Amino acid sequence: EMGALSVSFGESDGCDMRVTSVRAQDACSVAQAAFSGGEMLYKIDAPGRHFAINGAAVLAVAEVLGLDRALSLAAMGRWHPGAGRGAHVTIHLASTDPKATLALFDDAYNANPASVAAALAVLSAAPVQHDVGRVSKGRRIAVLGDMKELGPTGPDLHAALADLPATRALDKVHCVGPLMRHLHEALPDTQRGLWFEASDDMAARLPRQLDAGDVVMVKGSLSMRLARVVDAIRNMGQGNARDEAEG
């Protein structure tokens, strides 16, 4: 009635902009999508199927507006997530050894069951470095804060994260907040890391648990203030932490 044009996107057969394949690589995602009988290949400067699918929504808008497709695809290839939204940062732990690095996924701005599952999938597939730190084995480590506003199902939804295949593939999971305690208790002993009610305590203790070669993902609802944990990890560096999107 209002004359609005509805355009759908996603991976289902009925979507107007249908994502047909996604290849998540170490630092980017390459996807293919079909729209109006044509195919397009595009890249996003971040690993993760969820980023590729969201990118399809942007490309659908560009198509409907009649924008130049080549320019749209080029612009999409330059997009990268910002701080707190999945930014990938390399932390240099020793100024004398360029290999002594720690990789950080800063996803501390928000969290819900779907976005946490997507972030864990990215972490579980991330490459690690071996034989560069004290532990010698590079590890995939998650630091998770409460997912807020889930109502009475909140405790069960937090505990259920332990059963995700991506979670089971991790080496260690540290938890912050009363709701995340349900996940902490559901984890096997080999994966169970630190638990604190507040982010300040985790920020004070976590750096001693990390080592060169590790890949760490920090994610939680904004009110959990996990940006403080991100800052603590960044402060482990020798003054030259590098956002991968900035090169």
Task: Describe the role of every protein-language-model region.
Residues 2-5, 15, 26-27, 37-41, ...:
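ATP-dependent carboxylate-amine ligase
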Residues 8-12:
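Short beta-strand elements of ligand-binding domains
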Residues 32-34:
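A general beta-strand register signal
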